[in-house]
Amino acid sequence: LNQPMLDHAAKMQGADDRIAWRQADALALPFTDGEFDAVVCQFGVMFFPDRIAGYGEALRVLQPGGEFHFNVWDQISANEFADVVTQTAAAIFPDDPPQFLARTPHGYYDVGLIEEELRQAGFTQIAITTVAETSTAPSAREPAVAYCQGTPLRNEIEARGGDMLDHVTAQAEAAIAERFGAGPVVGKIRGHVVTAKP
């Protein structure tokens, strides 16, 4: 999270001396050993440059009996809006398809690998639950803009032609509307919720 995001969170939270908003490197947490009874990471571990090291840091700052909770997206084919956007971008750039969504947010979904990496970091009790839900939006426009312009997919699109962002977004909107309808849209989403203990 960048500092403006944390500043916004602090503003929305309101004054509470029990909460400190600060940037930290997940691979080198600025906290003492055993400082927390829980560590929570919402859709973030897939961005760690070294997940085992990040998991090790979570373990280090946990008190005995503490818990590490996180979630990750399942594979992109189980997350319909993201999949449609990725397929649309690939059709526009067939020689060099943007793969951010498939590679990163939806690229760390193998529960066997997740468990193995947690064990390598020192966790011994691991529970992984797969959760399927639906995502809704007022129209096809919202998920198209969210994925194409509100994630690092935007950088990959712009790298292939700075003037292509609006075109890819419009094509993604059309593809979502074609598959899910022109009015309010509902698509399947699926992820894994993980709890790990020492």
Where are the regions a protein language model picked out?
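Class I SAM-dependent methyltransferase SAM/SAH-binding core
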Residues: L1-T32, A38, I52-G56
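Short, hinge-like loop/turn segments at secondary-structure boundaries
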Residues: G14-D16, V40, T86-A89, A144-Y147
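Class I S-adenosyl-L-methionine
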Residues: Q3-G14, A90, E115, R119, ...
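Conserved Class I S-adenosyl-L-methionine
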Residues: R103-P198
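A short SAM/SAH-binding and catalytic strip from SAM-dependent methyltransferases
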Residues: A26, D37-I52, V72-I76
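Non-membrane alpha-helical structural segments and their capping/turn regions in soluble enzymes
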Residues: Q3, F48, I52, N79, ...
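Conserved catalytic/acceptor-binding region of the Class I
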Residues: I52-A53, Q63-P138, R154
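Short conserved AdoMet
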Residues: G14, P49, Q63, F123, ...
